[in-house]
């Protein structure tokens, strides 16, 4: 079941919302949300409901054991993390790993045909964060299994995030207020997210698919950029739209999830981009991988290695194929570049800000257009289609304007020629 389906909008959501509103007491409300979340998941994946419940039960028990057996807690949390990662490997990466082994060593191991459970990357990361936080003492182990299961399976953030930490919603699971103002804000936010998904992302996606489906040799520079920018904004409005809907649904039921996107295309570096894009995932890797590896406390070389490892894992998390692996490496390389080259760390004026926005968008754009094409060597060579000299101003204006919601009129100030040309390209720049 997806948020934009008629079943969800016209049947599921009204019933769950009304039931949650009229039921007295937090226990009844939680039971309603838990039942609804399991039905929501079972609608598309009835078999894998058992898998999700089993995962929640195992992590619930691990957390209790960590709290009870303090002298053995390091071993317990290690086993918990290994089992959670094994769950991902089996259901998400088994086919990819088998194919890779067969290709590299000429073996003929049968490739397992395992259907990927919806949301497994999200609920597994949430479960791991819960157990690790109990180990660290960030929160106590929850004695009530139903509350842990509700935290892991809560339907608004189950499919596409944001990834929620237990201590961020613990108090709201225990007691929360469903106010008229919160419901109104939630409905507005949900509608905004639904509009992003249906009215913008889907249209951008059709444009990108049509253009990327054409032979690369038949595309001119302008058309190639239209395809790249369309896909760039398709994934943003799709993913941020789902996050908006999840946050809005949370408000409607009295929960407050953290923001997951913060105008990422206004970033002036790849480092800043990842502070604004899929914030819950970036913060998860920061807290549970980057900092334990040493963070930036052991010199630049070690910092770069740590960042590279994190983005290698980020790429693998996004998908089980070589394309996502190289996509993670690609971003990791630019993060290392920004760490070593002083130019990226120095403050600058408006001109440098505009240049850095263009640089960031070029890097991100080239990365996503290659990800759009499932095989890396068939990626559309967008950046190789250098526009004619007379077109530089046009592309500058598109990129500077797409960099964020506010650029202070910089494109108009830099050159009358650039601004005059902008009017001519708005048809494919917006």
Please give the residue ranges for each predicted region.
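Membrane-embedded transmembrane alpha-helical bundles that form the catalytic cores
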Residues: 1-402, 406-407, 411-430
């Amino acid at each position: 079941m997806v948020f934009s389906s008629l079943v969800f909008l016209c049947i599921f959501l009204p019933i769950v919302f009304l039931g949650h509103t009229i039921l007295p007491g937090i226990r009844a409300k939680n039971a309603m949300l838990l039942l609804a979340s399991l039905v929501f998941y079972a609608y598309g994946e009835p078999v894998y409901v058992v898998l999700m419940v089993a995962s929640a039960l195992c992590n619930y028990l691990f957390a209790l054991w960590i709290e009870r057996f303090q002298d053995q807690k390091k071993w317990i949390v290690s086993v918990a993390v290994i089992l959670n990662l094994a769950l991902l490997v089996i259901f998400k990466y088994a086919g990819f790993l088998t194919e890779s082994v067969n290709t590299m060593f000429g073996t003929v191991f049968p490739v397992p045909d395992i259907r990927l459970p919806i949301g497994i990357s999200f609920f597994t990361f949430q479960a791991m964060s819960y157990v690790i936080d109990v180990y660290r003492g960030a929160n106590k182990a929850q004695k009530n299994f139903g509350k842990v299961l509700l935290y892991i399976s809560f339907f608004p953030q189950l499919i596409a995030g944001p990834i929620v930490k237990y201590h961020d919603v613990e108090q709201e699971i225990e007691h929360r207020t469903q106010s008229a103002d919160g419901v109104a804000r939630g409905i507005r936010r949900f509608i905004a997210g639904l509009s992003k998904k249906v009215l913008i992302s889907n249209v951008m996606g059709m444009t990108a698919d049509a253009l990327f489906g054409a032979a690369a040799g038949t595309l001119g520079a302008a058309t190639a950029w239209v395809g790249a920018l369309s896909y760039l904004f398709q994934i943003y409005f799709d993913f941020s739209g789902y996050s908006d809907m999840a946050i809005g649904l949370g408000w409607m039921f009295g929960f407050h999830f953290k923001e997951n996107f913060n105008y990422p295309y206004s970033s002036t570096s790849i480092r800043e981009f990842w502070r604004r894009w899929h914030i819950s995932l970036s913060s998860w890797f920061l807290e549970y991988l980057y900092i334990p590896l040493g963070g930036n406390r052991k010199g630049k070389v070690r910092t770069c290695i740590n960042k590279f490892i994190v983005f290698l894992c980020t790429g693998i998390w996004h998908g089980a194929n070589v394309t996502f692996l190289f996509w993670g490496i690609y971003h990791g390389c630019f993060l290392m570049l920004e760490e070593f080259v002083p130019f990226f760390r120095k403050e600058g004026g408006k001109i440098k800000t505009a240049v850095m926005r263009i640089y960031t968008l070029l890097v991100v754009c080239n990365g996503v257009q290659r990800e759009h094409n499932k095989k890396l060597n068939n990626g559309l060579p967008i950046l190789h289609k250098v526009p004619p000299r007379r077109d530089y101003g046009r592309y500058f204006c598109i990129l500077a304007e797409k960099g964020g919601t506010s650029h202070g009129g910089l494109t108009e100030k830099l050159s009358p020629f650039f601004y005059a040309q902008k009017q001519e390209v708005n048809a494919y720049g917006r």
